[in-house]
Structure formats: C-alpha cells, structure tokens
Amino acid sequence: MSERYPRIRLRTRFGGYWIHEGLRLDFYMRRPHTQMARAVMRSMDTYVNAVGVENFAFYVDEEGDPQELDAEGWALNRRKLLEVRWPRVILEEASTGAPERYHFEYQGRRIDDPELPVSAKHACVASFWLPSEYLEEHGPE
C-alpha cells in the first residue's frame, strides 16, 4: 500500500481545476426520516462547525435553484430537517469556478408509510464532502 494517495487534478485553461480529489462520506440509513431528523441535524452542525460555516454560501431550494445561505436560509433548512416528512437539504460553497470542496446533502425518505410502495433499497442518505487538503491539515485524528 502506498503512503500517498494519487493526486487527481484536471486543470482548466483559466488556471482552476475541473476535477480535484477529496473524500465523500455517504451514510445510507434504513430508518424513517422521522427517527433520523435530530441526529442528522446534529451531524450537519458538527460537520459545518468542523470545516467552518464560512465555507457554505448557498442552499438548493425546492426548484433546484441556489439561494443565499444567510440566517434565514439556515433557519429554513433546519426547519425542513425537523418538520418535513421527507426533506432534501443541500448546502454548497460559493461558486468559484473550481470543483466543490465542501458539500452537505441529505435526502430523507418515508420508508415507514404503508401507503407508499417502498423498495427494499430505499434509505435516508447523508453525504459529507472533504477536500484532501483538509485531511492533510488535520491528520488522521
């Protein structure tokens, strides 16, 4: 096994990057969102506090459009996590023309509703992205 991971960088002609290595942690939870909401909010808060709230500038609204992640945007997304039966929350960093480094995404599912045809593969999913530089700075601890 190598001590170093491969650097994967595809440069644009303007000096930025289209592709950049990093780590994406996806958690698939076979539990109804109603049982997961508070734990997901704590996880989101822990992640945002660890990487810095300043790294997030937008959230994605119900139409799929980016909206400014100001105090009102934070409150709206927290309410969605706690009050909506199957929320979708996406937090993104400011668009700089570079690949995203920090990203949080959660898709809640109603897997406990007997009225809905539910696949055995359905689950709530939380995703946390970290750039390789963050991992190098903070080490394995």
What are these regions (language model features)?
Residues 1-58, 140-141:
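C-terminal interaction module
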Residues 43-45, 50-140:
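Internal, hydrophobic cores of structured domains that mediate oligomerization or house catalytic pockets
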